[in-house]
Amino acid sequence: MQSPEFLSASSRLTVDLTALADNWRAMNERSGKARAAAVLKADAYGLGVVHAAPALYAAGARDFFVASVEEGADLRPLVPDGRIYILAGMWPGNEELFFENDLVPIINSEEQLAVFMAALSERGDHPCVLHVDTGMNRLGLSPEEALALAHDPARPASFSPVLVMSHLACADDPGHPMNRYQLQRFREVTAAFEGVPASLANSGGVFLGADYHFDLTRPGIAVYGGEAVNGAVNPMKAVVTAEARIVQVRTVPSGGTASYGASVRFGRDSRIATVAIGYADGYHRSVSGGGVTLRQAMPSGAFGFLHGMKVPHVGRVTMDLSLFDVTDLPEAAVRAGDYIEVFGRNVVIDDVARAGGTIGYELLTSLGRRYHRTYVGGA
């Protein structure tokens, strides 16, 4: 039975934890001999790490990646014996958080390596990960720096990484030559760290095949139901559904206009549903389609789903409200108080993102605080 708050909310978000767990299991299986971690940064991609982490742990995940040491400290009580990796690494002043919470810093630079080694000299042994940049040019030691470290006879015995990793720049495009280039560079580095486990594949990398799996894969967006490979059928289950209440239904005569700037003109008598969702809720203004000047050259706008039919968004997304054309639905079927699915099982979040010229990651992590959130299922 749904709560009164769910039934009366202006907008609501339903997170299917069973689908989340199933997606992780599917990625773990696709990883073959490697084991799959789970990426939980940005509050589990906006869905709530307090709920997502226990579900993934119950499904079998034991390795977790987050962005910052603060995220790691918050995650620790949720996965007591999990290994938590911190992508941003260790900096002067936050060393104690790593030791207190048993967090694994990812070493991205020689400067961070120096901070880590100084911390070891004061506090004793602690695991770390060596991040090598193989072409992304964002974070990581260069392959040359990593190889020099591997062959340095003066390297302290206390420096013993538990993982060597890199990050693929073009894994969502299986045919991109950068994938093979990065794989080759990574193999050159891992050969110098004989016996140290290795990790290269993100979500898209898992789909590239066994050559990219090594010992640990790092699926992120795929676990949350998003597309990992451009142009391919997405095999993952939808995890999140966003719905918003119809506040009012209006009739606009043929030739009439609606929204800011009179940005949409109707060629027939039309019925328009005003819906309680806007860019303050992470429903980006750019999904308006041609109703926004800078979008004139981009695809048409997004759709919603109501009573078994897709209904087009019209006009401009505003802070709190959006308009959907419900003319093709029976008049008696659409009433104020009904809910339109904005994305979920029937409206793919990546399609909404494409309509806005962005990606599903950005929509998920932009979700505002006004949704009534409901978590269903589990591992």
UniProtKB/Swiss-Prot annotation:
SMART domains: Ala_racemase_C
GO CC terms in record: cytosol
E.C. no: 5.1.1.1
Classification via SUPFAM superfamilies: Alanine racemase C-terminal domain-like, PLP-binding barrel
Cofactor entry: pyridoxal 5'-phosphate
Catalytic activity, reaction form: L-alanine = D-alanine
GO function terms (MF aspect): alanine racemase activity; pyridoxal phosphate binding
Pfam families in the record: Ala_racemase_C (PF00842), Ala_racemase_N (PF01168)
UniProt KW keywords: Isomerase, Pyridoxal phosphate
Pathway membership: Amino-acid biosynthesis; D-alanine biosynthesis; D-alanine from L-alanine: step 1/1
Single Gene Ontology BP annotation: D-alanine biosynthetic process
Modified residues (N6-(pyridoxal phosphate)lysine): K41
Active site (record annotation): K41 (proton acceptor), Y260 (proton acceptor)
EC main group: isomerase
Binding site for substrate: R138, M319
Signal peptide extent: none
Function recorded in the entry: Catalyzes the interconversion of L-alanine and D-alanine. May also act on other amino acids.
Similarity section: Belongs to the alanine racemase family.
HAMAP family: Ala_racemase
Name of the protein in question: Alanine racemase
Source organism (scientific name): Rhizobium meliloti (strain 1021)
Taxonomic lineage of the native organism: Bacteria, Pseudomonadati, Pseudomonadota, Alphaproteobacteria, Hyphomicrobiales
Gene: alr
